[in-house]
Amino acid sequence: MVADIAYLQQSQQEINQLEALFARQRAAYLAQPMPDATQRVQWLKALRDLLFKEQQALIEAIDRDFSARSADETLLAEIMPSLHGIHYAAKRVKKWMKPARRAVGLQFQPASAQVVYQPLGVVGVIVPWNYPLFLSIGPLTGALAAGNRVMIKMSESTPATGRLLKDLLARIFPEDQVAVVLGEVDVGVAFSKLPFDHLLFTGATSVGKHVMRAAAENLTPVTLELGGKSPAIVSDSVPMKDAAERIAFGKSLNAGQTCVAPDYVLVPSRRVEEFVSQYKEVVQGFFPRLSDNPDYTAIINERQLGRLRGYLDDAREKGATLVPLFAEGQQRRLPQTLLLNVSDDMKVMQEEIFGPLLPVIPYERLEDALAYVNQRPRPLALYYFGYDKAQQQRVLHETHSGGVCLNDTLLHVAQDDIPFGGVGPSGMGHYHGHEGFLTFSKAKGVFSKPRFNAARMIYPPYGKSIQKLVYKLFVR
């Protein structure tokens, strides 16, 4: 009882501190509502220099949170894209900030029109555990480029990374500019209730609904980067080694704990055995052993490991054939496993997998594969393997997904010049590059008239002049 009271008191204290922090950031924004390009570039360069200097410490912190996280995967999937994204924005922010001239109709002349891009104010970012660095720095980059103040809520599942990032960012930003927030679920709930000018959430669809509901109380606009079951479609003619190798990379990275990882693969029925053989050969080439392999990342915690084992048990009990590619390794290293003969009533086909399990589903014709995808919630990503241009266009035009890779996996997320975001149940809104700048800016339309006022002819009292001139010229 005493422990419960102490916990509640601590929790309330953290929430009070959170609200006070938000108030300080709002006051700081009001004191400097339009930072110039020089200031924004300085922020971005300081962030880039910090990440570059502290990359080893970040690698070690993320490794501690996972108990075993491939250092190369952290470099490839977190540090490198973060650095590139910052560099990309810093080079272009001055151009992005320039007011955009717009056309004015003849009936409103003389006049001018433009769009001015203004910082929103205080931006909230809620970060998941699977890529704690990239999914905090990516939104931070866009928000800073747009001139905002930023509060970042780190996941309670990555405490080492959260503490380190809080310490590092405090070295280069005052707390009323950028602040990292730590805490358990109750702090996260309170965070989503703050009256941010924009809130970006990355995580599960089920949690995203709660975040959006909380934000709606303040009419806070949200960007939701969710997930779903992202399909890979293998065509009838693509060289199977090409498809198997690239799908295996997408499923192996971070042990499949990636929101855009291939969730299941659709393969022509006559080529299923070929796919299984090639996939097994590729994965075992990637990872000659599982235990103590520094290249193979662990499942983040026991709860997630238990969830994935539960999927395997459920599928086995309902008639699926399991093809594990290794024996289970130490430190929560769960082997890649192919699942054949799956059915829609299995949990592995009902929920986002978020791990190294890959159902293989046969199809007869391309239209059957597209129908299978379209009967399900719209995914965050879709992958198609086939070099026929007409078939590629058919897949693009006849399916909906947040993004697409043709003949590869994951890499669309690393492109700074294309937007990243979901559609429907997989999310809403976009960020990365210019789209990130736009998401975190208010595009303010500005109409300007000179002293001469031709608009007097449409002022009341209405008479013959408006009938003869205005209506005759413009109502047609």
From Swiss-Prot:
Catalytic activity from the UniProt record: (E)-coniferaldehyde + NADP(+) + H2O = (E)-ferulate + NADPH + 2 H(+); (E)-coniferaldehyde + NAD(+) + H2O = (E)-ferulate + NADH + 2 H(+)
SUPFAM superfamilies to which the protein is assigned, alphabetical: ALDH-like (SSF53720)
GO biological process, one term: aldehyde metabolic process
Nucleotide-binding recorded as keyword: no
GO cellular component term of the entry, any: cytoplasm
Keywords attached to this entry: NAD, Oxidoreductase
GO molecular function, one term: coniferyl-aldehyde dehydrogenase [NAD(P)+] activity
Name of a matching Pfam family: Aldedh
Active site residues per record: E225, C259
The EC number(s) this enzyme carries: 1.2.1.68
Keyword Phosphoprotein: no
Subunit-structure text: Homodimer.
Protein family (similarity comment): Belongs to the aldehyde dehydrogenase family.
Name this protein carries in UniProt: Probable coniferyl aldehyde dehydrogenase
